[in-house]
């Protein structure tokens, strides 16, 4: 039979501590020095299409990842992410692209509605099929959102 001892065992009593912050920063500094390109030399560089600077890891891979262990097995107090307060951040280039597409589409809609022709240049042409395909006579477009909702509901009901 097994017996349960009173008090902490050797495994529980031993505590593992990680490196100090100074050790982590020193090691990180050493690794970052390895990633910096070497100073230019007087020799012409050889043509190597896949040459990598000397270092402990390839340039395409990310650098070392710092891992912070829990102190005494406790999690750090963190706030749960709230979806109500979060806003997506957009880059300036993204906003410019959205603005360009929006303005271009508004111009096309104005020209299709019979707005000013503008210098008599080419106008957008809306495609209208003159002889519809008889196979598409009873075609009903599908609402993908509704279809995915039905599939999701079917999976949920089949699992329970």
Curated annotation (Swiss-Prot):
Pfam families: FAM195 (PF14799). Its main location: cytoplasm. GO terms for cellular component: cytoplasm; cytoplasmic stress granule; nucleus. It is found in: Cytoplasm, Stress granule; Nucleus. The keyword Phosphoprotein applies. The modification N-acetylmethionine is found at residue 1. The modification Omega-N-methylarginine is found at residues 35, 65. It comes from the Eukaryota. Residues 1-64 are annotated as: Disordered. Interacts with DDX6. Interacts with MCRIP1. Residues 37-61 have a biased composition (Pro residues). Keywords: Acetylation, Cytoplasm, Methylation, Nucleus, Phosphoprotein. InterPro entries: MCRIP (IPR029428). Coiled coil: none annotated. The modification Phosphoserine is found at residues 61, 82. The gene is MCRIP2. Belongs to the MCRIP family. This is MAPK regulated corepressor interacting protein 2.
